[in-house]
């Protein structure tokens, strides 16, 4: 997953960087650095983000 893909996923969720960080158990600054490709996005983070997107889709897009 690239930083740009992470930004797109976060935007689909309607989350701020802080909200996504809280949902993933990460600091918002780490999210920002991942989105700028300054930190690698580990598989665990990628899978957790995919899970959040799946849950949103299953709920019909409602949070």
PLM region descriptions:
Residues 1-12:
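A short, Lys/Arg-rich alpha-helix, primarily the initiator
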Residues 42-62:
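DNA major-groove recognition helix of helix-turn-helix/homeodomain DNA-binding modules
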Residues 17-19, 27, 44:
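Glutamine-centric residue-chemistry signal
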Residues 25-40:
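Recognition helix of helix-turn-helix/homeodomain-like DNA-binding domains
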Residues 6, 29, 45-47:
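Short, intrinsically disordered, low-complexity terminal segments
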Residues 6, 20-21, 31-34:
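Conserved hydrophobic/aromatic packing and binding residues within compact polymer-binding modules
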């Amino acid at each position: 997953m690239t930083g740009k893909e992470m930004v797109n996923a976060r935007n689909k969720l309607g989350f701020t960087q802080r909200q996504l960080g809280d949902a993933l158990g990460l600091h918002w600054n780490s999210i920002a650095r991942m989105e700028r490709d300054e930190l690698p996005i580990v598989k665990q983070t990628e899978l957790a983000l995919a899970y959040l997107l799946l849950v949103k889709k299953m709920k019909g897009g409602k949070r």
